[in-house]
A protein has these predicted regions:
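Cleavable N-terminal signal peptides
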Residues: 7-8, 18
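Positively charged n-region of N-terminal signal peptides that target proteins for export
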Residues: 1-5
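PEST-like low-complexity, intrinsically disordered acidic/proline/serine-rich tracts
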Residues: 19-274
Length: 274
């Protein structure tokens, strides 16, 4: 097990709502069973305009089921699931790396991910946020969706006001890219491009380049479940697009806690690799 991976787990355990002293508040909009507990199997809430309401605090279901190795096998016809450390863990043959990208991935992995931006209190990429053990909060309005990430205090904007996705290179590259969203029935479809070059998709260092486009499909089959199918199309680093599924669960009656990565950071000077 990588030393850096264990450090991430230790940080996540300290920062998670279950381990922290933070007041809970029983929200009135949470569907509840007769015993007063949240009814996770209830239908998802809807907004005033009839769309699925994705508002809430969510955490990665795979990680909090206690799994650290390979993810569970997806049913036939569904995208493979991913893990905190390895986005390609559910693919039998791994990711379709181009030769240079595979070499970079191996170098990052063998170096204990010491150059991962997250390890240096820098922003994580979108895929890392999806699979990170720390929770995230979705705030949904008709024209804008904000995702607040507890890890490294990340803030992401998804514009749902009808604006087109800019061409790659037309705007300043961002850590989180530029995102626009639209609805296909009850599915929220988010397209993102204009990423910074040299990105990390996971802790092991699967590359993401400035030529990437990411498409996320958000669905909520019930109140308690959030599914995000993520398609990575990065012809600079991979020979073909690929799709993974991230399963998350809602954390009702809880909020994010303050997480200032640099406040107590003392490990960077001691991180080593090959």
């Amino acid at each position: 097990m990588m030393r850096s991976f264990l450090s991430f787990l230790e940080v996540a355990a300290i920062a998670s709502p279950a381990a922290a002293q933070w007041p809970s508040f029983a929200r009135k909009d949470v569907p509840r069973a007769t015993d007063g507990k949240p009814d996770f199997d209830a239908p998802p809430l809807r907004t005033a305009d009839g769309h699925i309401d994705f508002t809430g605090v969510f955490e990665n279901l795979w990680f909090y089921n206690g799994r650290i190795g390979r993810p569970p096998v997806s049913p036939p016809g569904e995208p493979p699931q991913t893990t905190f450390a390895e986005i390609g863990a559910g693919f039998k043959e791994g990711l379709p790396f181009r030769p240079w990208a595979r070499e970079l991935y191996q170098q990052r992995k063998e170096s204990n991910a010491k150059d991962n931006p997250d390890a240096h209190c820098l922003p994580m990429g979108l895929m890392q946020f999806h699979i990170h053990p720390q929770p995230r909060k979705i705030v949904q309005t008709p024209d804008l969706i904000i995702i607040l990430y507890e890890g490294n205090a990340g803030i992401r904007q998804i514009f749902t006001d009808g604006r087109p996705l800019p061409k790659n290179g037309d705007v300043q590259p961002w850590w989180y890219g530029y995102s626009t969203g639209h609805w296909e029935g009850d599915t929220l479809v988010v397209d993102t491009n204009n990423f910074r070059d040299g990105g990390w998709l996971d802790i092991n260092g699967s590359p993401l380049t400035d030529q990437a486009k990411m498409t996320e499909r958000y669905t909520r089959p019930n109140y308690g479940t959030l599914r995000v199918d993520v398609t990575i199309d990065d012809p600079k680093a991979y020979t073909a697009p690929f799709t993974v599924r991230v399963n998350q669960k809602i954390v009702p009656d809880e909020e994010l806690i303050e997480f200032i990565c640099a406040e107590n950071e003392r490990s960077t000077a001691h991180m080593v690799g090959k």
